[in-house]
Amino acid sequence: MTQETALLSTSPEGGDLNVPARKVFVKTYGCQMNVYDSDRMSDALSRDGYVATDVLEDADFVLLNTCHIREKAAEKVYSELGRLRELKKAKALEGREMLIGVAGCVAQAEGDEILRRVPAVDLVIGPQTYHRLPDALKRARAGQRIVETEYAIEDKFVHLPAPDKAKTRARGVTAFLTVQEGCDKFCTFCVVPYTRGSEVSRPVAQIVAEAEKLVEGGVREITLLGQNVNAWHGEGPHGREWSLGDLLRRLGEIDGLARLRYTTSHPRDMDDSLIEAHRSMAKLMPYLHLPVQSGSDRILKAMNRRHTAAEYLALVERIRAAQPDLALSGDFIVGFPGETDQDFEDTLRLVEEVNYAQAFSFKYSTRPGTPGAELKEQVPEDVKAKRLEILQALLVKQQRGFAEACVGREIDLLLEKPGRMPGQLVGRSPWLQPVNVDAKASQIGDIIRVRITKAGPNSLFAEMIGESDARS
């Protein structure tokens, strides 16, 4: 099959099969949920005959799926839109049409302002309405300028296509699956409640059906996603209320699904059922991302976290008692308004006590529209930078220590992709570290037994000691 033939339209709506398919280029910013959303939007467009392209200049439609968490997120998007505007002009001079769309949390936050500032943009669509993207794009092609950012009454997941087996297989043996969206915690630094809305949980049957489709497409590991994933709840058999632990146990029953993970969690929603799942489920990987943000009770209160440092530490102790092999990850913000040297020392003390396998740390940045933006006593930038440097040095030391402690251990490794060297494959350890192994006789998707031989700065190295598992 020639490349031109491969790009012919396959629209189920009966388009001319001799007309080249339109191409869509999607650029994804930010979190894993945006990666999931981008895949689902691409799948939805494929029903109208669009094919994905990695070449920006070839695209008939360019979609930016944006993130609004970090400082100047919107300005970075506007900068990218300026470049796309020039590309759109150049293509128009050649008689080629290119539409531009903005999706995600910047779209939700900015709305009509995007069209005002960048008239070259054709459509703006929020994270709760992207199931309407195919229709919005048709209207944009007819000359309308579209803004779809209201919170939809209908369940968007009902209107999205099920995962396509061929596309799933092409995306790899690991997959994300959104089970929960939004957040009701209203931390004073965070925009999520304003861009993603209140907490909403997908129904059990819907989640299980999507997971089974992913496994049919060759997926062996699924990561459940949510802005506050452990707030998920739903109705189980006989009307019993289920929490995330129950859902994990149900997904663990799917034949062919070897591994489960979930992210991101809030300490206040780690219930007994979920902790028990960590103790009893072999398929649930011993890795937990549990952000705390600060080790100072005073700052935690100002952040509206609604827990203390001692309560967080007690929770960590309970989880580790249930799963002693657990690798813990966290998030930290330094320089929150009013943070003193003592507050920062309290954070360092908590980090020392927990001993993280991995963590993410950032300087506080004002997010317009959040309560934190109105707080006095903003910390000077040079103080933030110095504190971040100190904290990151400690976290890197802990991460290296955890990696070095893995040397000599024997683990099961899920092979995910080719390595840089001939015969080398790369997988993820149970604790989410990349692991390089010489495994010429194995293939992507196999789970093999390896011994860790070396810890590098960003990955581990291993030797194969066991045969690949049988694959159905």
Curated annotation (Swiss-Prot):
Organism: Rhizobium meliloti (strain 1021)
CDD domains documented for this protein: Radical_SAM
NADP is among the record's keywords: no
Residue ranges occupied by any TRAM domain in the UniProt entry: 404-466
NCBIfam families tied to this protein: miaB-methiolase (TIGR01574), MiaB/RimO family radical SAM methylthiotransferase (TIGR00089)
Cofactor remark: Binds 2 [4Fe-4S] clusters. One cluster is coordinated with 3 cysteines and an exchangeable S-adenosyl-L-methionine.
Binding, [4Fe-4S] cluster 1: C31, C67, C105
GO MF: 4 iron, 4 sulfur cluster binding; metal ion binding; N6-isopentenyladenosine methylthiotransferase activity
InterPro entries, per the entry: Elp3/MiaA/NifB-like_rSAM, Methylthiotransferase, Methylthiotransferase_CS, Methylthiotransferase_N, Methylthiotransferase_N_sf, MiaB_methiolase, rSAM, rSAM_horseshoe
EC number in record: 2.8.4.3
Subcellular location: Cytoplasm
Family the entry assigns: Belongs to the methylthiotransferase family. MiaB subfamily.
Gene (name only): miaB
Catalytic reaction list: N(6)-dimethylallyladenosine(37) in tRNA + (sulfur carrier)-SH + AH2 + 2 S-adenosyl-L-methionine = 2-methylsulfanyl-N(6)-dimethylallyladenosine(37) in tRNA + (sulfur carrier)-H + 5'-deoxyadenosine + L-methionine + A + S-adenosyl-L-homocysteine + 2 H(+)
GO cellular component: cytosol
Radical SAM core domain sequence ranges: 169-403
UniProt-annotated binding residues for [4Fe-4S] cluster 2: C183, C187, C190
The protein's required cofactors: [4Fe-4S] cluster
UniProt-recorded name of the protein: tRNA-2-methylthio-N(6)-dimethylallyladenosine synthase
